[in-house]
């Protein structure tokens, strides 16, 4: 058909001829592996005090999303059995490792909810020691480092008490209807949170080195 063999748009076509960008062609010719948010995302130059974190669960959600370790995608783990919702954005810190085999958990205080799978810069302000069904499951309490309403906070003692009580009550109650017991201890200051993150970074590094030796 006239116009097709010479690469021009047919007469009467509403669309211009497609221009094939060399960068697009080169990207199509290569095999790509999707980046894994736990292992491929940098923790950030300011870590352990200021760090990147990946949000799994947005504030106000009743759905518990979590990282699927095999694929690096965010999957639906379950819908909470009770009527409570996550009080703040919740996720994990990349390139960290805890004794339970998971990355370090973090709860990020900020003005808005954000979508699962995005990452943001956070500042550690405290540590919430927690025991989940007899196992240690501590949470870092942080603020969004790029939120003008929260970025000035440096320690958990600066957060209004009712906010901390809201966080405590959520984690104490969100598994009750599943007949699972969770105990939350007293909040600890920013120094303890930073030390916990540093330890999890070291543990991750040691694990990677050990894996390379095998």
Curated annotation (Swiss-Prot):
Its main location: cytoplasm. The keyword Hydrolase applies. Substrate binds at residues 64, 78, 90, 174. Mg(2+) 2 binds at residue 105. It catalyses: diphosphate + H2O = 2 phosphate + H(+). It is found in: Cytoplasm. Its cofactor is Mg(2+). InterPro entries: Pyrophosphatase, Pyrophosphatase_sf. Belongs to the PPase family. This is Soluble inorganic pyrophosphatase. The gene is IPP.
């Amino acid at each position: 058909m006239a116009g097709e063999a010479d690469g021009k748009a047919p007469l009467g076509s509403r669309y211009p001829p497609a221009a094939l960008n060399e960068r697009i062609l080169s990207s199509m010719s290569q095999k790509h592996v999707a980046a894994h948010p736990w292992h491929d995302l940098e923790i950030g130059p300011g870590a352990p005090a200021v760090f990147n974190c990946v949000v799994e669960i947005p504030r106000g959600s009743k759905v518990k999303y979590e990282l699927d370790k095999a694929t690096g995608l965010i999957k639906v783990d379950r819908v909470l059995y009770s009527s409570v919702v996550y009080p703040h954005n919740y996720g994990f810190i990349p390139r960290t490792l805890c004794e339970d085999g998971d990355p370090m958990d973090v709860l990020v205080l900020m003005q808005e909810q954000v979508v699962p799978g995005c990452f943001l810069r956070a500042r550690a302000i405290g540590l919430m020691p927690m025991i989940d069904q007899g196992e240690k499951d501590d949470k870092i309490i942080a603020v969004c480092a790029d939120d003008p309403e929260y970025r000035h906070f440096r320690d958990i003692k600066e957060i209004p008490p009712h906010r901390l009580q809201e966080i405590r009550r959520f984690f104490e109650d969100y598994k009750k209807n599943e007949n699972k017991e969770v105990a939350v201890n007293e909040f600890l200051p920013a120094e303890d949170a930073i030390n916990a993150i540093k330890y999890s970074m070291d543990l991750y590094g040691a694990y990677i080195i050990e894996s390379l030796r095998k």
